[in-house]
Amino acid sequence: MNLYATILAGGSGTRFWPVSRVQVPKQFLVLQGTQSLLQATVQRITPLIPPERIYVVTAAHLQEQTVAQLPEVPAANILSEPVGRNTAAAVGLAAWHLMRVDPEALMVVLPADHAIADSAAFCASLQRPLWRLNMPICS
């Protein structure tokens, strides 16, 4: 099992207006501490998934800003949506890309704009179902 993370970071920021805007959507805001919500999402998942297996799907106009925010994630792993078509299309783009990179990939999809206080509990909640994937279906 090859576990990858896909972080959805293509939001336009209109629902959190006036704090977030089209050029500075919610995922780039620092709501607590010193990290943006996007940076905190990457840090939160890194104990389970190394940066080279983290992919971020973002809007084309946010590509450079996303790369700049995440120096630990390879720039090639920042996928740009040609046109924003919401969640299903972004997940589909990442799945299509990962299928080409690693046919054995298992993808965890995460939003970039959630504030989660207990990172250890979050990672533990992701690990619980993963062990079942290594169990045989029939014995």
Predicted features by range, described:
Residues 134-139:
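A short, conserved acidic/glycine-rich loop-to-beta-strand motif
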